[in-house]
């Protein structure tokens, strides 16, 4: 992989909320404490339904006059009506802006980040440039220091600059997995509880007060355990073959989970093939440093 290059990843879910009460509305629907979020700040969060299940996972980027929720593609049709349902008398308007932007991811070591991060973001975590209609967001999708660039199609200068210095989206999967950034619709969906992702400290405030789904989150926090959890894994396949997600993890004839995302690790030191992955694993098997020889001879290491 050429670490000097970024990644062109296409359209994402981009939801815009405007109005004086926009952050109040989001705070009532998110696990993160957004009561005091200021322009230029970014917060990672879950959006929950009334039962405390994960409707989405992504980042909230606050600007001077509007706030964006950004996540994996294909969610706006569900999320916009969900948010709008809870706007009653508040000064807030929600709309789908997904098709207006094309996304580029720039890791901290990429040529673009080295040359332009300071100019585009300064000391902020997000900013909007009217000159080229570009939204820049600090989002740890490929690790701390990653910049997500949302460029409008008509911003040809930015488009040309980014496209010439970016690979297609296929190459970024390994970095996303190693950075433990779950992808909604792949690693998690509406069946999951937020604590099953194992990123509580990044995404959940236990002190913010009431929000939609809060009772379920608080109850699970009091119990202190989940029945399954997303974990970082490495797999060593004895044969030099492929691994397609979802990949079932079977130990002594019993399913202990599924690999939800996987990317091959280049190595000349071992026979067969090595894979990094994210896996939803049953309780009793997802503890870090656990190691299992699965049925079929696959060696699973939980990291």
Language-model-detected regions and their locations in the chain:
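Short, conserved phosphate/pyrophosphate- and ester-handling motifs at nucleotide-, phospho-/glycolipid
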Residues: 19, 108, 213
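Glycine-rich, small/acidic residue-mixed loop/short-helix segments
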Residues: 175, 192, 198-204, 212-214, ...
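Short, intrinsically disordered, mixed-charge
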Residues: 27-35, 75, 81-89, 222, ...
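Active-site beta-strand->loop segment that positions catalytic residues and contacts the acyl thioester
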Residues: 49-65, 234-242, 283-284
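Acidic, proline/glycine-enriched N-terminal capping motif
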Residues: 1-57, 61
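Solvent-exposed residues in well-ordered beta-strands and their adjoining turns
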Residues: 18, 72, 151-152, 236, ...
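Acidic, low-complexity central loop/insert segments
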Residues: 5-14, 59-182
């Amino acid at each position: 992989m050429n670490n000097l290059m970024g990644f062109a990843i296409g359209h994402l879910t981009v939801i815009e909320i405007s109005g004086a009460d926009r952050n109040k509305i989001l705070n009532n629907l998110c696990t993160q404490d957004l009561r005091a979020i200021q322009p230029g700040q970014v917060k990672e969060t879950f959006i929950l339904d009334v039962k405390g299940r994960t409707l989405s996972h992504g980042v909230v980027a606050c600007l001077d006059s509007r706030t964006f929720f950004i996540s994996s593609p294909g969610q706006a049709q569900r999320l916009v009506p969900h948010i709008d349902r809870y706007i009653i008398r508040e000064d807030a308007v929600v709309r789908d802006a997904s098709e207006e932007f094309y996304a580029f991811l720039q890791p901290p070591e990429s040529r673009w980040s080295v040359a332009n991060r300071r100019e585009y973001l300064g000391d902020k975590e997000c900013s909007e440039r009217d000159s080229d209609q570009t939204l820049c967001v600090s989002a740890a999708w490929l690790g701390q220091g990653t910049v997500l660039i949302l460029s409008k199609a008509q911003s040809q200068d930015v488009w040309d600059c980014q496209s010439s210095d970016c690979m297609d989206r296929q190459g970024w999967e390994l970095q996303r997995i190693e950075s433990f950034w779950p992808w909604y619709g792949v690693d998690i969906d509406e069946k999951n509880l937020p604590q099953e992702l194992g990123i509580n400290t990044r995404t959940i405030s236990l002190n913010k007060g009431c929000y939609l789904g809060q009772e379920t989150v608080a109850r699970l926090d009091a119990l202190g355990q989940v029945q399954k959890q997303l974990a970082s894994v490495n797999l060593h396949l004895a044969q030099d073959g492929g691994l397609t997600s979802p990949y079932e993890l079977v130990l002594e004839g019993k399913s202990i989970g599924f690999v939800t995302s996987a990317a091959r690790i280049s190595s000349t030191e071992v026979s067969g093939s090595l894979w990094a992955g994210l896996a939803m694993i049953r309780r009793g098997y997802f503890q870090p440093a656990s190691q299992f020889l699965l049925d079929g001879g696959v060696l699973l290491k939980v990291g």
